[in-house]
Swiss-Prot record:
It catalyses: a quinone + NADH + 5 H(+)(in) = a quinol + NAD(+) + 4 H(+)(out). HAMAP family: NDH1_NuoH. GO terms for biological process: aerobic respiration. It holds the Pfam family NADHdh. One of its GO terms (molecular function) is oxidoreductase activity, acting on NAD(P)H, quinone or similar compound as acceptor. The keyword Electron transport does not apply. The lineage of its organism: Bacteria, Pseudomonadati, Pseudomonadota, Betaproteobacteria, Burkholderiales. The chain crosses the membrane at residues 20-40, 92-112, 127-147, 165-185, 206-226, 254-274, 294-314, 329-349. One of its GO terms (cellular component) is plasma membrane. It comes from Bordetella petrii (strain ATCC BAA-461 / DSM 12804 / CCUG 43448). This is NADH-quinone oxidoreductase subunit H. The gene is nuoH. It is a multi-pass membrane protein. The keyword NAD applies. Belongs to the complex I subunit 1 family. PANTHER family: NADH DEHYDROGENASE SUBUNIT 1, NADH-UBIQUINONE OXIDOREDUCTASE CHAIN 1.
């Protein structure tokens, strides 16, 4: 982009290379982080509206036009509530835990490409970075349960950590398979790898995306992402009939809101990763003029919105699993299945019918 090059040259001349680099990095972080936080806020609104429609209700309607200001009312309510720290709790860890849960979900966006050159840090190990940084969130859950000094919070934290680690393995095997077929850990190159092939050459780009040849893995990824974020129907971590809110049971006010933000930020991140790994990222589904005029970040947003809506649909449609059923699904079905499919794809790539050349 020429105007960005002009801005960079003027900035370096005015402030010097080092100061400009620091300032420009902060600007890029703000430009990415603020919309993500707004998306998290309005995802709560969309969830309540969608579930309301499925229940033949209206959902939020009172605050602003058609309830569009409801997220801001919720934030104001949580900001004005007192953060009560239990007497016997470890106060420092009690406060740190919500931050540890939220920050990895925001830091992972540093390597997410919104377009061919629109990325904060276009590193060659981007996929590895996302897998590593998102695994840190489980520590926030464990610390919250332990620091609360409550048997219910600790039981919820144990459930959450075991469930998150279990389904991280399944997601890891799926992403390793995508790495295998794309031949790169760079997320921009993974997207570009889905724009090649016979279908892409004939304008049917959506048939060259990874979702078609790796359809079973795509399904496993979406279900594992729901379990990874402790969302319904895998939300036994906060089973209201047993342990109330799980590891968050002792939290209130803005500390509770940070856990809430972390959960929804992870939903958006994993949905965006599904769009990049399987749905062609910023590319248009059909390579014809009206569709190719739409900016890539809008296509990525549409695909992410469709995937994240599946999370909401699952919540409104399915009953909660028992904890032993969840662990059995992860360890006895998903992990072996993804391992077998990884071997199948590796063998497939050695045959004359390799479609990823």
């Amino acid at each position: 982009m020429e105007w960005l090059d002009i801005l960079e040259s003027h900035g370096q001349a005015l402030l010097g290379p080092t100061a400009w680099l620091v300032l420009w990095t902060i600007v890029k972080i703000v430009v990415i982080a603020v919309p993500i936080i707004l998306c998290v806020a309005y995802l709560t609104y969309w969830e309540r509206k969608m579930i309301g429609w499925m229940h033949v209700r209206l959902g939020p309607t009172r605050v602003g036009f058609r309830g569009l200001l409801q997220p801001f009312a919720d934030v104001f309510k949580l900001l004005t509530k007192e953060v009560v720290v239990p007497t016997q709790a470890n106060k420092i860890l009690f406060v740190v835990a919500p931050v540890v849960t939220l920050m990895p979900a925001l830091a992972a966006w540093a390597v997410v490409p919104f377009g061919p050159e629109v990325v904060l840090a276009n590193v060659n190990a981007g996929l590895l970075y996302v897998m590593a940084i998102t695994s840190i969130g489980v520590y926030g859950v464990i610390v919250a349960g332990w620091a609360s000094n409550s048997k219910y919070a600790f039981l919820g934290a144990l459930r959450a950590s075991a469930q998150m680690v279990s389904y991280e393995l399944a997601i890891g095997f799926v992403l390793v398979t995508v790495l295998l077929v794309s031949g790169s850990l760079n997320m921009s190159e993974i997207v570009l790898g889905q724009t090649r092939g016979w279908f892409a050459e004939h304008g049917l780009t959506f048939l060259s995306w990874n979702w078609l040849p790796l359809l079973p893995l795509f399904v496993i990824y979406v279900i594992s992402a729901v379990a990874e974020t402790n969302r319904h129907p895998f939300d036994v971590v906060e089973g209201e009939s047993e342990i109330v809110a799980g590891h968050m049971v002792e939290y209130s006010g803005m500390a509770f809101a940070l856990f809430f933000l972390g959960e929804y930020a992870n939903m958006i991140l994993l949905s965006c990763m599904a769009s990049i790994m399987f749905l062609g990222g910023w590319t248009s589904p059909i390579d014809i003029a009206p569709l190719t005029w739409i900016p890539g970040w809008i296509w990525l947003g549409i695909k992410t919105f469709c995937v994240v809506s599946l999370f909401v649909w699952f919540r409104a449609s399915f009953p909660r699993y028992r904890y032993d059923q969840i662990m059995r699904l992860g360890w006895k079905i998903f992990i072996p299945l993804t391992g077998v499919w990884l071997v199948v794809v590796a063998i497939w790539m050695q045959t004359p019918w390799n479609i990823w050349r």
